[in-house]
Amino acid sequence: MENDVLSVEIAEHGAELTKLYNKKTGTDLLWDAEPKFWKRHSPVLFPNVGKTYKNTVKINGTQYPTSQHGFARDSEFKCIHAGKETSTFLLTSTEEMKEVYPFDFELFITYTLEKNVLHVKWEVKNPSDETIYFTIGAHPAFRFAKNEEGKTDYILKFPGKDELKYCLINLKEMAPDPEELHEMKLNEETYPLTEELFENDALIFDNTQIEEAWICHKDGTPYVGVKSEGFPSYGIWSVKDAPFVCLEPWMGRCDNIGFDKEISEKPGINKVESGETFEKEYQIVVTI
């Protein structure tokens, strides 16, 4: 898809955004999936964001195995509409999926270009007679503008904020403790990017603290941002020495340490009643 400002490519595998090109500046903004650092571009996280505790989930009293970030990112979607500025992809539940996630669902993902903005809309339809539960999230990785640049050439900006609080993954338990919070004190809404920032994996922000985040050049010039109104959780992540940063709005997130209750009792879980549809959208904004 393309317009006068942006050119994008989306794969049917995972309905994953694989290219985001700024035609005005000649810049590829999306990570190229070089496996040395990370083999993905912008996976869709469904039906679970992150890991469930001990890699299992309890649904109606039965334990099911789970994989990190769910199966949608490795599933084949069907492109049901391909236009010049908007495309829609569909993933429908199968019997194989029900072995790990025993719900009927239809997941629609629509990408729409509007000038310098890429809108990404999720719809989860429930065609069954029972309530379904899930979390869903975005994971776009934004590469730095020049090959020789690193994290210290950029800063993060959070408009309207002067302080944020986040929790980290306990690397022994592979789950976060939401009671163990860290403060991020901002300087004029900004915070420096460093390699050390991601030593404990992702930074996890809860309580709808972040609804807009930007990667900016060190002089404060905006580079690329993500707007995500009403998303309760947010992840910021990178890999050591990798020339990219992920800005990740999440509708729900990984399990906390020790969570072993029914999926319906999980904090931040989304539910869709029989015949109803869940809808949510975020936007990637490119500076031109």
Region locations from a protein language model:
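Hydrophobic residues positioned within well-ordered beta-strands of beta-sheet architectures
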Residues: 8, 87-89, 107-109, 120, ...
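A short, structured loop/turn motif at beta-sheet edges
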Residues: 80-87, 112-117, 146-150, 239-242, ...
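Active-site/ligand-binding surface loops and adjacent short beta/alpha elements
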Residues: 141-144, 148-228
